């Protein structure tokens, strides 16, 4: 099988040296992502496209899906690459490939040609289109808005029969821009803002301020791992968790109620800036949108920015909530966000929307900054790829099994799309489907007299969810790894 990768248009208008650098980085990213599917896979770069060739036909759908999620790719063409002799040979091969698709449909033929030939692209379009029209009685040529467009590419003595076109996410390849640190809470905004910076070519590390205990951290780990695994797995990134409960306790005890929200955000920016400086990261990323909550007015945002020299990027600053939720739905983080607890909003009963710098600084004089220094020093930093192993250590009380008993039921916790693409069937045991993002609200509705064996393809999400369910008091869960 063969895929032709078309570059994001903004890459093609760069200078020759920059364009070449971007293409090299994108080629490396594609190799890093796809090596898990087929070790014999070949990735070859050209000036205006990248070729991906693989031998393992069983991985076709997985490879195609992975390519559509790599930043820097505009679209993917799945092609059949065959030699040809003349225009009639092109027609005959096109007839075999497209006959079934054109039955009872209107169509047109579009050809792109590279190399020296004794015919033009239009000549091929007319010849092949006329031949298809004659040999498929129920098909009819229609040059504008046809039901089917037959795409062909001719390159020297090779014919590319385009079997499908699949849109990518666009943007710049990860690694073409500098690293950023995303302040992730697991909600709608931080997930979308992280995705937007990945799409713009940044390697996104994650910094999480834990205000709600182990269950909250597990939930945010899931979001960060999902974003990395889906859009940024070509690069290693850090997940830094800071226990912010001591800081919140100090604020609740010593700070005036109206100033709490702004001061909490200032403390977070201070802490994140120290983490960024420690790891050589150039900027922070937040999901703040202008006017969305009390701390996100222009006055308050300016005061929050003032505590650090580190650049703070806010890709959602002009977005409304509906737009953000729609983006979260598109990238797959909506269901995570809906079940994620929100802690920052309850810290102050009557927050100020127009904080005064002198008042904020006066309140902060009451704060013991050694507490902030200590929580940053004790921050837990892990390679995001190690989240699975770390979870395995944390879920020591959850048994991992490769078989099953008469009272067991396998619980397939993959997303709905994954379940539909590759349904799980295991002989001798019932399989129930419940996506991971619904476990927090729907697991209690299941038969609690059964033992539920959580399963996902790689075992990461099943371990994370097993820990979460154990913390919620469900002891009838195990991890299924056949």
Curated annotation (Swiss-Prot):
Subcellular localization, as worded in the UniProt entry: Cytoplasm
Binding site for ATP: 183-184, 265, 287, 296
Disulfide-bond pairs as recorded: 344-456
Domain spans labelled Rhodanese: 404-482
InterPro entries linked: Rhodanese-like_dom, Rhodanese-like_dom_sf, Rossmann-like_a/b/a_fold, ThiI_AANH, ThiI_fer, ThiI_N, THII_Thiazole_biosynth_dom, THUMP_dom
Gene Ontology biological process terms, A to Z: thiamine biosynthetic process; thiamine diphosphate biosynthetic process; thiazole biosynthetic process; tRNA 4-thiouridine biosynthesis
Keywords: ATP-binding, Cytoplasm, Disulfide bond, Nucleotide-binding, Redox-active center, RNA-binding, Thiamine biosynthesis, Transferase, tRNA-binding
Gene Ontology CC entries for this record: cytosol
Active site: 456 (cysteine persulfide intermediate)
SUPFAM superfamilies tied to this protein: Adenine nucleotide alpha hydrolases-like (SSF52402), Rhodanese/Cell cycle control phosphatase (SSF52821), THUMP domain-like (SSF143437)
Subcellular location, principal: cytoplasm
Catalytic activity line of the entry: [ThiI sulfur-carrier protein]-S-sulfanyl-L-cysteine + a uridine in tRNA + 2 reduced [2Fe-2S]-[ferredoxin] + ATP + H(+) = [ThiI sulfur-carrier protein]-L-cysteine + a 4-thiouridine in tRNA + 2 oxidized [2Fe-2S]-[ferredoxin] + AMP + diphosphate; [ThiS sulfur-carrier protein]-C-terminal Gly-Gly-AMP + S-sulfanyl-L-cysteinyl-[cysteine desulfurase] + AH2 = [ThiS sulfur-carrier protein]-C-terminal-Gly-aminoethanethioate + L-cysteinyl-[cysteine desulfurase] + A + AMP + 2 H(+)
Keyword Kinase (UniProt): no
EC class name: transferase
Pathway the protein takes part in: Cofactor biosynthesis; thiamine diphosphate biosynthesis
Entry EC number(s): 2.8.1.4
THUMP domain residues: 61-165
MF (Gene Ontology): ATP binding; CCA tRNA nucleotidyltransferase activity; tRNA binding; tRNA-uracil-4 sulfurtransferase activity
Gene3D superfamilies found in the cross-reference section: 3.30.2130.30, HUPs, Rhodanese-like domain
Cross-referenced PROSITE patterns: RHODANESE_3, THUMP
PANTHER family: TRNA SULFURTRANSFERASE
Chain's role: Catalyzes the ATP-dependent transfer of a sulfur to tRNA to produce 4-thiouridine in position 8 of tRNAs, which functions as a near-UV photosensor. Also catalyzes the transfer of sulfur to the sulfur carrier protein ThiS, forming ThiS-thiocarboxylate. This is a step in the synthesis of thiazole, in the thiamine biosynthesis pathway. The sulfur is donated as persulfide by IscS.
Family statement drawn from the similarity comment of this UniProt entry: Belongs to the ThiI family.
NCBIfam families in the cross-refs: ThiI_C_thiazole, tRNA uracil 4-sulfurtransferase ThiI
Protein name (Swiss-Prot/TrEMBL): tRNA sulfurtransferase
Gene: thiI
């Amino acid at each position: 099988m063969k895929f032709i990768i078309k570059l994001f248009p903004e890459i093609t208008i760069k200078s020759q040296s920059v364009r070449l650098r971007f293409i090299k980085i994108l080629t490396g990213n594609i190799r890093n992502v796809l090596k898990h599917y087929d070790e014999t896979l070949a990735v070859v770069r050209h000036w205006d496209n990248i070729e991906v060739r693989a031998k393992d036909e069983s991985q076709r759908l997985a490879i195609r899906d992975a390519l559509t999620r790599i930043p820097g790719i505009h679209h993917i063409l799945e092609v059949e690459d065959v030699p040809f002799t003349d225009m009639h040979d092109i027609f005959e091969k096109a007839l075999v490939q497209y006959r079934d698709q054109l039955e009872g449909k209107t169509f047109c033929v579009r050809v792109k040609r590279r190399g020296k030939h004794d015919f033009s692209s239009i000549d091929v379009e007319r010849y092949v289109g006329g031949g298809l029209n004659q040999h498929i009685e129920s098909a009819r040529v229609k040059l504008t808005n046809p039901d089917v467009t037959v795409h062909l590419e001719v390159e020297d003595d090779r014919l590319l029969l385009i079997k499908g076109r699949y849109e990518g996410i666009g943007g710049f390849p990860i690694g073409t821009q500098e690293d950023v640190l995303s302040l992730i809470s697991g909600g709608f905004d931080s997930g979308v803002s992280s995705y937007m910076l990945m799409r713009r070519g940044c390697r996104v590390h994650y910094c999480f301020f834990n205000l709600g205990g182990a269950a909250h951290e597990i939930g945010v780990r899931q979001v960060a791992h999902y974003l990395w695994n889906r859009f940024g797995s070509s690069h290693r990134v850090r997940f830094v968790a800071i226990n912010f409960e001591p800081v919140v306790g100090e604020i609740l005890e010593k700070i005036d109620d109206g100033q709490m929200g702004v001061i909490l955000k200032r403390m977070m920016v201070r802490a994140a800036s120290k983490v960024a400086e420690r790891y050589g990261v150039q900027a922070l990323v937040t999901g703040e949108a202008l006017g969305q909550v009390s701390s996100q007015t222009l006055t308050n945002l300016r005061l929050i920015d003032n505590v650090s020299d580190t650049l703070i990027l806010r890709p959602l600053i002009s977005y409304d909530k509906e737009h953000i939720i729609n983006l979260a739905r598109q990238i797959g983080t909506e269901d995570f966000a809906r079940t994620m607890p929100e802690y920052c909003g309850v810290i102050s009963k009557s927050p100020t929307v127009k904080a005064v710098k002198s008042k904020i600084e006066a309140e902060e004089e009451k704060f013991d900054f050694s507490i902030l220094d200590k929580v940053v020093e004790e921050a837990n930093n892990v390679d995001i790829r190690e989240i699975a192993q770390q979870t395995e250590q944390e879920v020591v009380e959850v048994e991992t099994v490769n078989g099953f008993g008469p009272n067991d039921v396998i619980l397939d916790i993959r997303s709905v799309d994954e379940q539909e693409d590759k349904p799980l069937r295991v002989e001798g045991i019932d399989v129930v489907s419940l996506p991971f993002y619904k476990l927090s609200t729907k697991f209690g509705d299941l038969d609690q007299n059964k033992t539920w064996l959580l399963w996902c393809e790689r075992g990461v999400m099943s371990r994370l969810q097993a820990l979460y369910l154990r913390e919620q008091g469900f002891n009838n869960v195990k991890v299924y790894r056949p």
